[in-house]
Amino acid sequence: AECCGQKRSLSREALQKDLDDKLFGQHLAKKVILNAVSGFLSNPKPKKPLTLSLHGWTGTGKNFASKIIAENIYEGGLNSDYVHLFVATLHFPHASNVTLYKDQLQMWIRGNVSACARSIFIFDEMDKMHAGLIDAIKPFLDYYDVVDEVSYQKAIFIFLSNAGAERITDVALDFWKSGKQREEIKLRDMEHALAVSVFNNKNSGFWHSSLIDRNLIDYFVPFLPLEYKHLKMCIRVEMQSRGYEVDEDIISKVAEEMTFFPKEERVFSDKGC
């Protein structure tokens, strides 16, 4: 059976290689994730848990990135006993049950962190999370040594959301229109605007959330919309992973069948990879 903690001390190089080989068109996300995760895991006494909020359209790589993080910490990756995935529409479907969900969520997190300090919690579909629910986990994310005799400082919380995606796309499109490379986009072009737009978005799951108010989210990580060349990279890797011979003509054909926006310029893929 797998041990709590991690499969080995995390190798920054292995994480970097995984991100480079598998996550395309996301120079900002790669850099933030690499530094945040490797820095956090090499710190024997973190002051608070690591909290990452990943933002962008469907298909840009948010789930994939959280899978890569999990696999670099635990052999079993997302199937590890120490990695817990919550999907808003599946686990918290009814607005009328928010009080019950809050209690369940607190008990689940407390129980799992008691069993393993290095637990990973992933919240998918944050934008479909009922307002106020996520504030239930605030005590676990704060700068407390212990809460009810449990220390949460080695845990990792990852939030995935489409909220803020319009803002990210606007910035990417502005760069494209002014003839700049997307790699010139800096985190500072995004991060503040992202936090504000998510905080003020009634449908973000973080609407007026104390997690943002109190600066408890360590990193807002933007995932940019993908271009034609990135789709081809995704398709190539997918063909290889399924054992097919890589055929550039087929790759181009598949990529061209995707829909792109804006309608005239056709710069970004509608559905990502």
From Swiss-Prot:
The gene is TOR1A. N-glycosylated. Keywords: ATP-binding, Cell projection, Chaperone, Cytoplasm, Cytoplasmic vesicle, Cytoskeleton, Endoplasmic reticulum, Glycoprotein, Hydrolase, Membrane, Nucleotide-binding, Nucleus, Synapse, Synaptosome. Its EC number is 3.6.4.-. Protein with chaperone functions important for the control of protein folding, processing, stability and localization as well as for the reduction of misfolded protein aggregates. Involved in the regulation of synaptic vesicle recycling, controls STON2 protein stability in collaboration with the COP9 signalosome complex (CSN). In the nucleus, may link the cytoskeleton with the nuclear envelope, this mechanism seems to be crucial for the control of nuclear polarity, cell movement and, specifically in neurons, nuclear envelope integrity. The lineage of its organism: Eukaryota, Metazoa, Chordata, Craniata, Vertebrata. It comes from the Eukaryota. This is Torsin-1A. It comes from Cricetus cricetus (Black-bellied hamster). Belongs to the ClpA/ClpB family. Torsin subfamily.
